[in-house]
Amino acid sequence: MHFLATAAVLAGVGLASAYTVPANLQQIYNKHKTGTCQNKLQDGFSDGISGSRSFAYCGDIEGAIFLHSSANGGQYVNMDIDCDGANNSAGDCANDPSGQSMTAFMDTVKQYGISDLDANIHPYVVFGNSGSSPTFDPQQYGMEPLSVMAVVCNNQLFYGIWGDTNGGTSTGEASISLAKLCFPNDGITGDNGHGEEDVLYIGFMGQDAVPGASAAWTARDTKTFEESIKALGDRLVAKLSA
């Protein structure tokens, strides 16, 4: 599931499916990046690279949860690569040293006509930690499995789903398809992600964030799935305030 990223940090030109960061979300990004989190739901996590456990799940945005660290004057987190799920060794996931054949919500997603999420197609975020101390379960704060998440990366907005959890204490991880949307010029593979702590992951509380059968779960490409959850993502982001 998790790997030590060897990041390339070149800023890439966004793909056609990138969305402009709306003004309210840009304000949130700028406001909360610096400083400290006032409402730490759980701290003591790492980014999977440095070993520093300065990262926390933060509740400073009403109705949402995001990852933040007070280190270095305040920062978000990186984007390590997750290849778990169906076809976990396919394509650029072939060199993933820790890929697993299932995701945390495999049993739930089966109702939508697929055996599991495919990291090469479905843009999902790894959010929540179990198996090591500390732990964090987003469901205890109202997040629902397979709910839409907003990801601000490389000065763009993308939508993903909450699709997996981490068995250790590291944070900042997403499916390879989401990472390629964010950083198309970084040479993303199962063993190479984005190391800068500048990615904002936002999870939304409530059943309203779950796309259910309206999402294109059986899509054969990432863009098709991404577009199927955009309208819901836009509505969720529009409700956010700094």
UniProtKB/Swiss-Prot annotation:
Glycans are attached at residue 87. Keywords: Allergen, Carbohydrate metabolism, Glycoprotein, Glycosidase, Hydrolase, Polysaccharide degradation, Secreted, Signal. It comes from the Eukaryota. Residues 1-18 form the signal peptide. GO terms for cellular component: extracellular region. GO terms for biological process: polysaccharide catabolic process. One of its GO terms (molecular function) is chitosanase activity. Chitosanase catalyzing the endo-type cleavage of chitosan, the deacylated form of chitin. Chitosanase may be crucial in the degradation of the deacetylated portion of chitin in the fungal cell wall. Chitoolisaccharides produced by the hydrolysis of partially N-acetylated chitosan are known to have many biological activities, including antibacterial activity, immune-enhancing effects, and elicitor activity. The chitosans with higher degrees of deacetylation were shown to be the better substrates. Belongs to the glycosyl hydrolase 75 family. This is Endo-chitosanase.
